[in-house]
Amino acid sequence: MNLPGPIHDFLLVFLGSGLILGGLGVVLLPNPIYSAFSLGFVLVCISLFYILLNSYFVAAAQLLIYVGAINVLIIFAVMFMNGSEYYKDFHLWTIGDGVTSVVCTGLFISLITTIPDMSWYGIIWTTKSNQILEQDLITNSQQIGVHLSTDFFLPFELVSIILLVALIGAIAVARQ
């Protein structure tokens, strides 16, 4: 979307705060159903970010795949599980929590040191800067691949780390 600067900045701040609040809801809400709905809200906010970046195909794929399929699957899985087992043997702090805290703190510190060095202005306006490269490409999927491997490399890696952590968490929950 080609919006004026102040409106674009307001929408970025609004969606960013929605992402932060939704992420906190995923982690802090005690009811898994509410956490799943909060995750759906986060995924919708991410797709709206893609719309602001003029990536309509990625936004549509985000909505269809993650919100429409994955989040609904999570909600069904949570609904079929026994709700009383979440509150049995509740320990406030375990060794795994300490290790997880150290790993997450390390990732957070590395991201805080990496993110200020990133040219975020260049990421937002890549559609204008890569016009010569895009003329040589034939399909939109090739353009998406080039952008993911050049301009959007850091956000793509952050998403892959988040998906890896989610996969490890799903395996840990499935073993219990």
From Swiss-Prot:
Location (main, coarse): plastid
UniProt-recorded Gene Ontology molecular function terms: NADH dehydrogenase (ubiquinone) activity; quinone binding
Location in the cell: Plastid, Chloroplast thylakoid membrane
Key words, A-Z: Chloroplast, Membrane, NAD, NADP, Plastid, Plastoquinone, Quinone, Thylakoid, Translocase, Transmembrane, Transmembrane helix, Transport
EC nos: 7.1.1.-
Top-rank taxon: Eukaryota
Family: Belongs to the complex I subunit 6 family.
PANTHER family xref list: NAD(P)H-QUINONE OXIDOREDUCTASE SUBUNIT 6, CHLOROPLASTIC (PTHR48479:SF1)
Subunit structure, as described in the record: NDH is composed of at least 16 different subunits, 5 of which are encoded in the nucleus.
Official protein name in the record: NAD(P)H-quinone oxidoreductase subunit 6, chloroplastic
Organism per entry: Coffea arabica (Arabian coffee)
